[in-house]
Amino acid sequence: PFFNIPGEGSFALIMGLLSGYPVGAKIATNFRKNNICSKEECERLLSFTNNSGPLFIIGSVGISMFGSSVIGFLLLISHILASITVGFIFKFWKYNKKSKTSLNTYNSKHSNTLNISNLGEILGNCITSSINTILMIGGFVVIFSVILSILNSSNILYILCNLIKPIFDLLHIPQTFSAGFISGIIEITNGLNIISSIPEKQLSINILLSSFILSLGGISVFLQVWSIVAKSDLSIKPYIYGKILQAIFSTIYTFILINSFSIFNFNL
């Protein structure tokens, strides 16, 4: 297989791309708990299936923040390409043919349970799990929004901005973007909102930084994923490595698309 993952792993990738953070990680963890995939295969899934959803990228970021659906589609294309690239790179993560788990084995072990379980119980468990996940996501967003406000009011954010100034100078990125970038590293939505609102003659910088933050996810998303993965025997390392690589690749793909297709050239 392209990702060295059983076919059922495609469900985690598709749902992760469609539903946004942290659905991919939750599905990968559930696969491990139910022995659908081996530990190594689930860790590979963790590295690339946890992504921002198209509704958030196109609707919230593209249309609401940047005022352009084209920018939203540009960010989405780069995001997906980067995710697939990371998945291909991680196909060799702890690769061992003996570690593969047969889906037939899973079916034989759990067929009786699936038959006995009634529809009401299944729906109830799904709804309960969904509500808990939504509350967790909302709680993290609120907490980190408060943290950002505290950092901003206490001038700690200003200190952090000065720390990354040499890097921004090296990359020829205006210092006006530093606050938005740091905010995005902490909490993705707040950071993207700041970056998209900065008036800059070269809009490509806004888009490139947004692409990086969208793929990285930030500390808030990382802790969401960690709270899910901690309930299993999976390592969080593939997720960390994968998100860093995805952020880099996503930025590169965005840069290539902007400079290769006139429809994506937003230099004003």
Spans of model-derived segments:
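Alpha-helical membrane segments and immediately flanking helix-loop junctions
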Residues: F3-F66, A179-E200, N206-S232
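Juxtamembrane loop-helix boundary motifs flanking transmembrane segments in multi-pass membrane proteins
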Residues: S19, C37, S111-C126, G139, ...
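Transmembrane helix-loop junctions in multipass membrane proteins, especially transporters and channels
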Residues: S68-S69, G87, K91-L103, S153, ...
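Alpha-helical transmembrane segments
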Residues: G72-F88
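C-terminal transmembrane helix pair
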Residues: I84, K201-L268
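Intrinsically disordered, low-complexity non-transmembrane regions of multi-pass membrane transporters
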Residues: Y95-T128, L268
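Transmembrane helical segments that form the transport core of multi-pass membrane transport proteins
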Residues: I127-L208
